[in-house]
A protein has these predicted regions:
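Membrane-lumen/periplasm interface segments of specific transmembrane helices
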Residues: 129-131, 142, 147-155, 160-236, ...
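Membrane-interface transmembrane helices that cradle and orient dolichyl/undecaprenyl
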Residues: 61-63, 101-120, 130, 154-157
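Hydrophobic, aromatic-rich transmembrane alpha-helices
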Residues: 215-252, 291-297, 368-381
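Transmembrane-helix motifs of polytopic, lipid-linked glycan transferases
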Residues: 42-63, 96, 100-104
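Short periplasmic/luminal acceptor-recognition loop of GT-C membrane glycosyltransferases, typified by
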Residues: 409-418, 426-471, 501-507
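Membrane-proximal lumenal/periplasmic loop motifs of glycosylation machinery
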Residues: 3-25, 38
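Short acidic/glycine- and proline-prone juxtamembrane loop motifs at membrane-interface regions
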Residues: 13, 83-94, 133-136
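Membrane-embedded helix bundles of polyisoprenyl
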Residues: 68-81, 92-99, 119-127
Length: 542
């Protein structure tokens, strides 16, 4: 909006997932950053709460009765990802928009061929909107094309209608994509650099990542909202109900593609070699609501002996693989969402006596596998369904509480500190020249406070990053000779040749001989200096 393009940490960026930042722009009309952040919290709550509307629309479109509709809406209300409303995470709008995306595709499935073209065009344009929020949302687009190919395979006479629908879907998406590339994002590359080829070591780790992520995804979705629709798939014969033939496959494909994308773009790159890779179920969580609806429809049917056997085989296979392949979940509990209950117990197994942590983790996984088998028996025999529905709601509440606890521990800022940081922002806005912020800690709470409450452009370079780069070998950061930048996004600034002001965190050993302490009030743990030698910053290091 300032005419400087997209920027992250005051450097040009190709990151184009701008939908969530646009959604919180109204809060910037307020004067202080403290007031703006409070307003963003209320906006987040409103966006998250709006997820009940597409959940209700989905339930009604699937012909659910009032009791089941209330159950699906109730699960939506207490989904763990709802806790993201207290953060700056884009899940705030990803959840409601994902549910609307599924709704549009469902209406396209149920529509007559001519009307389906319009629904597909709308779904394609909406998918681009969702793509502006998260690139992983493309799993909806890919899954839809695969489902239409499956429908065509079973009804060759419908090839023209299927071709027209896919053309409308992909065409509307591409029009939005190319229009944005030619205007708003002109000259920019890709948002992520995680699309490159893997190394040999990463290729070897990829099969484990795929299997492990898939097994945990099934567990996160309570197993049977995945396994029951899988064993209850029907061929899409002419005149068949798309809610029972096409929708289950569409959701399962979306889930599978999402898991594969996570394994390829995150697990093999950030958890390489780890026996307990982190789980990013927050990218998949919106699929739980429509999968629950499909599961309820599947349970209405009488499972044949063959399908019961398939379900038993799938349950046993999942249980054996889960016990044998998986171990635990790595650090990063805020991404686990629906797996908070698993992680809560797993994190405390090191406190148990007699057996080691590895053995107790194996016991915990075995208990879960047995519990899933018992759950399957109860579902197939149609026993205790109301109790199980209540248990699902309780489990969601517990996972929500776990997410809230983690977010509060990670992001909470005392009101007094927030006011001080907001006052610092006002003071910095009056200063002329460049401001260099040197936090102590790479991507830690030091930088979070300043980056959140200071709206002015500042240059960020962590003290640890300076040490590792060798820029402080002589104790002097010479900005005319050395190009430095923050740990993320991992590039050096091209326009940082002077630092008129230095904002240093406690622990950063700046040499104050050429610095003059400013009058601006700073939050505890920070000091603002006027740099008398703007081209150099000296440090008291040997």
């Amino acid at each position: 909006l300032q005419g400087r393009g997209l920027r992250v940490r005051n450097m040009p960026s190709d990151y184009q997932k701008i939908l969530y930042p646009l959604c919180i722009l109204p809060a910037l009309l307020l004067k202080t950053t403290a007031a703006q952040i409070t307003a963003i919290g209320w906006l987040n709550a409103a966006y998250m709460a709006s997820a009940v509307f597409p959940a209700y629309a989905l339930a009604r479109a699937m012909g659910m009765n009032r009791r089941r509709t209330a159950f699906l809406v109730g699960v939506t209300v207490v989904l763990p990802t709802m806790s993201a409303a207290s953060t700056f995470m884009s899940e705030t709008v990803f959840l409601p928009l994902s549910l609307w995306q599924v709704y549009f595709f469902l209406r396209a499935m149920l529509a007559e061929p001519k009307a389906r073209v319009g629904w597909c065009a709308a779904a394609g344009a909406f998918c681009y909107l969702l793509y502006l929020n998260k690139e992983v949302a493309l799993y909806y687009l890919i899954a839809w094309v695969l489902v239409r190919a499956w429908v065509w395979w079973h009804d060759k006479a419908s090839w023209r209608a299927e071709l027209t629908c896919n053309a409308a879907l992909l065409g509307s998406f591409l029009v939005c994509f190319l229009l944005a590339k030619a205007t708003l994002f002109r000259g920019l590359g890709n948002s992520y650099n995680q699309t490159g080829w893997l190394t040999a070591e990463q290729w070897r780790f990829l099969p484990f990542a795929l299997v492990c992520d898939a097994l945990f995804a099934v567990l996160a979705f309570w197993a049977f909202p995945v396994l029951l629709p899988l064993c209850g798939l029907h061929r899409p014969r002419r005149g068949s109900d798309a809610r029972r033939t096409q929708l289950p496959l569409f959701l399962l494909l979306s889930l599978g593609i999402g898991v594969a994308v996570i394994a390829w773009s995150i697990t093999v790159r950030e958890d390489l070699g780890s026996p307990s890779p982190r789980q990013h179920t927050r990218y998949l969580e919106p699929l739980l609501i429509p999968l629950l609806a499909v599961t309820l429809d599947t349970l209405d049917e009488k499972l044949t002996k063959t399908r019961r056997r398939i379900l038993a085989v799938l349950t046993i296979a999942w249980g054996v693989l889960f016990v044998a392949v998986c171990r635990a979940i790595g650090a990063g509990a805020g991404d686990n969402t629906l797996l908070q209950w698993f992680d809560f117990v797993a994190d405390r197994t090191d406190r148990l006596p007699v057996l080691g942590q590895g053995a107790w983790l194996a016991v915990w996984r075995a208990v879960i596998a047995v519990g899933v088998a018992v759950l399957g028996v109860l579902l197939v025999r149609r026993r205790g369904r109301r109790v199980l529905a209540g248990a699902a709601l309780v489990l969601c509440v517990l996972c929500y509480a776990g997410e809230w606890r983690i977010n509060r521990w990670t992001y909470e800022v005392p009101a007094g500190t927030a006011q001080q940081a907001s006052a610092l922002n006002d003071a910095l806005a009056e200063l002329d020249g460049r401001v260099l912020f040197i936090p102590y800690g790479v991507r830690q709470r030091d930088s979070q406070l300043i980056e959140t409450y200071v709206a002015r452009d500042v240059y960020i370079v962590e003290y640890e990053t300076l040490l590792q780069s060798g820029a402080l070998a002589d104790g002097v950061l010479d900005l005319t000779a050395e190009a430095v930048g923050p740990e993320y996004p991992g590039r050096a600034y091209t326009d940082l040749d002077t630092a008129d002001w230095v904002l240093a965190a406690d622990g950063v050993p700046v040499d104050t001989s050429a610095l003059e302490k400013a009058d601006a009030a700073c939050p505890a743990g920070y000091v603002l200096y006027r740099n008398l030698d703007a081209q150099r910053v000296r440090f008291a290091v040997s």
